A protein has these predicted regions:
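Divalent metal-coordination and catalytic microenvironments
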Residues: 11, 32, 56, 85, ...
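Short hydrophobic segments within beta-strands
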Residues: 33-35, 86, 149
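Gly/Ser/Thr-rich loops at beta-strand to alpha-helix junctions
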Residues: 36-39, 89-93
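Ordered, amphipathic secondary-structure segments that act as subunit-interaction surfaces
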Residues: 77-88
Length: 162
């Protein structure tokens, strides 16, 4: 049985007790951008319930044009007002450089990716960079409540980056 088949069986059990549709806008008016790392259960880390927040994930939890697009939709069309950023210790994005990664892909495929992997060397600095990208974006109208954190994968604690 594949992992997907197991997840489909889990969904059958979930659907049996599903409470029904929730409103489209998040009830807490929050958008979270976090790393896709499987060790981060964003809902548990923040104590989020279903329907409370938009959770946007990518490699590193970095702010790219696509995250700006998602945040603009979240704020402009669905009423979110707060943004929470979550990076984490022991992140894979700390283990390589963009140039090395792109070079390896080019060596393998013959094509150098046009996109940036957005690897970084310093967690706190990258959180600050992500906040700065949001603040600089004309597409994000609500910028009063943007906070960034580093999740410690050993202790389970969030540490705010200032």
């Amino acid at each position: 049985m594949s992992a997907t088949d197991e997840y489909l069986a889990n969904n059958e059990r979930y659907a049996e007790t599903f409470a029904g549709p929730l409103p489209l806008p998040p009830s807490r008016h929050v958008a979270v951008v976090a790393c896709m790392d499987a060790r981060l259960n964003v809902y548990a880390i923040l104590g989020l319930g279903e329907g409370e927040a938009h959770v946007i994930r990518n490699a590193g939890g970095v702010i790219t044009d696509d995250e700006i697009r998602s945040l603009a939709i979240s704020q402009r069309l669905l009423g979110t007002r707060e943004i929470i950023l979550i990076h984490h210790t022991d992140c894979g994005m700390l283990t390589f450089t963009d140039d090395d990664f792109k070079g390896a892909i080019q060596d393998e495929t013959g094509i150098k990716p046009a996109w940036s992997a957005e690897a970084f060397r310093d967690l706190d600095e990258d959180v600050r960079q992500s906040v700065a990208r949001i603040l600089a974006s004309p597409f994000i109208p609500h910028k009063d409540e943007i906070r960034g954190f580093v999740f410690d994968v050993i202790t389970g604690k969030l540490n705010e980056v200032s």
